[in-house]
Amino acid sequence: MAWVMHEHADVDTLAASVATELQAFCGEAIALRGQALLALGGGRTPLPLYRRLARCPLPWSQVTLLPTDERCVPHDDPACNLREIGAAFAAADGVELQGLTPPNGDPETSERHARAALAQYPQPFDAVVLGMGMDGHTASLFPGVPRLPEALDPASDIDACRIDPQPLPPEAPYPRVTLTAARLLRARSLHLYLSGADKRAVLERALRSHDPLRYPIGAFLHAADARLHVHWSP
């Protein structure tokens, strides 16, 4: 089995439990290597987790956070994942944030910028936190986009690529840059963070499908060489 399910009583328990796990992973990484590296999904669902983790006692100046994906918007735009993550970690004094796009969010240079940024961090992530949309996408790995097979290839040596959702989501109509599945799977711990019955139903369909082009989260649920910890609450 490439995945393991952790069910939590409610969203507060979910956030507290996963924050405790991530704190432990960070502490272990810092003790062993002097640095912890995390890739974090955007959106509203994980923000309580991030705020709780930010209050944990860690040497935050030795922790680096990257988004798993980013919208090609300026860094001060409310739609910017880096901006939201930074706000959620306001209590984590000294934490380092690494963006995937240039400050102006230029779509034409964002892929190159992301690959150069990731080249500074060749080591595996100490933890990755993924979310999942109602269409089964994770990060910005959307079903049906032309570059999806390339972005999901587990043998790829490409760390990031530009994704243009088709059609663009009306709530966030922007080109994206996303970490590839191969880069996200290069992690010491891999977590999917979900809540609600609707998301549980999508998860069950993805588990049955075994087709990551239809449900991109399946590339992580069924990965041969990684174990995905699925954290869910009602």
Where are these regions (language model features)?
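Short glycine-rich phosphate-binding loop at a beta-alpha junction
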Residues: 34-41, 126-128
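A glycine- and small-aliphatic-rich helix-loop capping segment at beta-alpha/alpha-beta transitions
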Residues: 52-60, 83-87, 143-152
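Ligand-binding beta-strand-loop-alpha-helix segment within the catalytic cores
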Residues: 2, 61-129
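N-terminal glycine-/serine-/threonine-rich phosphate-binding loop
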Residues: 1-38
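Short, conserved loop/helix-junction motifs that constitute active-site signature segments
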Residues: 56-64, 91, 151-153, 182-187, ...
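Class I SAM-dependent methyltransferase SAM-binding "motif I" and its flanking Rossmann-like core
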Residues: 134-182
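Glycine-rich beta-strand-to-loop/alpha-helix junction loops that act as flexible
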Residues: 40-45, 130-134, 195
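ATP/nucleoside-binding phosphotransfer catalytic cores, i.e., glycine-rich phosphate-binding loops
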Residues: 180-182, 186-234
